[in-house]
Design a protein with these regions (language model features):
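A short, Lys/Arg-rich alpha-helix, primarily the initiator
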Residues: 1-20
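Key DNA-contacting residues within the recognition helix of helix-turn-helix
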Residues: 9, 34-35, 48, 62
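Short C-terminal boundary/hinge segments that cap the last helix of small helical domains
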Residues: 55-64
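Recognition helix of helix-turn-helix/homeodomain-like DNA-binding domains
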Residues: 28-42
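The alpha-helix within a helix-turn-helix
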Residues: 12, 23, 51
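Short, basic-rich loop-to-helix N-cap that marks the start of a DNA-contacting helix
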Residues: 39-52
Length: 64
């Protein structure tokens, strides 16, 4: 799934999380979150876990 980096950054800022704390909250390795952030894509389950950790709907961080 394509993740919009800007939307992800905004959601992280709203939740007051950096990549490390997001990874811990999503219960996934830090490199996984960094890869999503840099590549802009990931598996549906991964984006779902990130959205859940941010307390948002997954559609809020998907690319248009």
């Amino acid at each position: 799934m394509k993740v919009d980096k800007r939307k992800l950054e905004i959601a992280m800022a709203r939740a007051k999380l950096n990549r490390d704390t997001l990874a811990r909250k999503a219960d996934m390795p830090i490199p996984t979150v960094c890869n999503v952030y840099s590549r802009g894509s990931c598996k549906p389950a991964t984006v779902g876990r990130i959205a859940e950790a941010l307390g948002i709907d997954v559609t809020e961080i998907l690319a248009d």
